[in-house]
Amino acid sequence: MIKVRLPIPDRLIVLTFDDGVKSDATYVAPLLKKYGFNATFYITEGLNFLQDKDRYLTWEEVRGLDEAGFEIGNHTRHHKDVCTQSREELIADLVHIDRRCQAKGIPLPETFCYPGYSNCPEAVDVLAERQFLFARRGMAPEYPYHNEGGRGPAYNPTQHHPLLIPTTGASGPNWTYDDFIWAVEQARDGNITVLTFHGVPDLDHPWVHTEPDTFKTYIDYLHEHDCTVIAVRDLDQYVTPFTAIKN
């Protein structure tokens, strides 16, 4: 049966949060639930996820995010540059997170984001083999990469591969309120805005840090301007995912 997808509305915003930072559960999720917003939380066991449970989620908290209706996505076991990994290493990293999710009763992740935004055709081929629906990258090459945040292109499903969805705005010290407004305004005429956050706050990685009060200002703006705020997997309501294209 052919799935009938909805027209892409203006002000369609995708929220993503990388690395499994503790604030995902303690601050971000309750605020998003208040407004009925969805989001994707991309989980890795790299960085200090396994060692520092004051700053990173426990797997029980990850399960809690899933039970609250949010999407849990795959961000690899080791958080390595996927372009430096062999095919076998990348597959092992992906399978590890899949199995950790399954062990906790979390649905098998359907979407992926590239650690450090790095991507290459070989990695895309692996994601395709693993049947991911969508994958999120960074701002480059359309916009210059800045490790403290910045602007990127809106996601245009007629132009961008579903396993190479760009980041329209990446939060960090280099990303201002004006940049946020600009990113939201790109969500029109069939384009979708994809926002990338890390910790709110991110004490381990200040170059991707977002102040809680600043984040609340962003979320209030999305609510006040009647934005539709979704997880990456929810794009399937509007956009043909990779597996459907392949089939």
Task: State each model region's role.
Residues 56, 166-171, 206-209, 213:
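Gly/Pro-rich active-site loop or hairpin
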Residues 13, 33-133, 138-151, 157-166, ...:
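Metal-dependent polysaccharide deacetylase catalytic core of the NodB/CE4 family, i.e.
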